[in-house]
Amino acid sequence: GEKSQEIIKATLKKLQDFGPDYWCGYSYSWFGNMKARAFDGEGAADALRTFAECFCLPNTFHANGDQTKSGKSKFTYRPFTLEGNFAFAAGIQEMLLQSHTGVIRVFPAVPVAWQDVSFDKLRAMGAFLVSAEKVAGQVRQVRILPEQGGTLRLAIPEGCKVASVTGNKGDKLEKEGVLILETEKDKTVTVQYN
């Protein structure tokens, strides 16, 4: 709820205010994930960009210390680890798709500059493969392939209206900004927005 969001935002601000002097590379990709979960696309992109630019070698290996010596961390060593790269990839997915609340949200934490963005078959909780497209800053289409079938809850993106739904089983219901549909196994549901 709203109170929880206030606590989360205050906690993230406190982490940032303390400063990252002794953060290592994966701390930035971890922080990017938290920013994405808090629906802060700008903050998520900034943290992930810092990870990629300052803590990865030209071959994309994560070197843990600030390789640019730009002050992003007092650690400048080079131990190779994998978790930072994995967290970076997870952070990108969290920016594009979230479903941990039981409601699928597309593009919940993308920066304003990402006006044209799409993804194909990212996995959401409930055994759904989700694809979506955003053009000129507006979500245009979401395609969902249910691997098991069942009830689908899809958040209607801010500023969008559902134009059409195909592939669902039975009626569609819109409730408090969420589209609720019944799905069949392996039958793609397509939602168009205008």
Labelled PLM ranges:
Residues F119-D120, V142, V178-L181:
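Beta-strand-rich interaction surfaces with strong enrichment in secreted/lumenal proteins
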Residues G65, V162-E182:
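Solvent-exposed beta-strand/loop surfaces of large extracellular or lumenal domains
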Residues P79-S131, V135:
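Catalytic cores of secreted or luminal carbohydrate-active enzymes
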Residues V130-A132, V139-P146:
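Short, well-ordered beta-strand segments enriched in hydrophobic/aromatic residues
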Residues L154, K175-N194:
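C-terminal beta-strand-rich structural cap/linker in extracellular carbohydrate-active enzymes
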Residues G1-S99, V103, R140:
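Active-site core of glycosidic bond-cleaving carbohydrate-active enzymes
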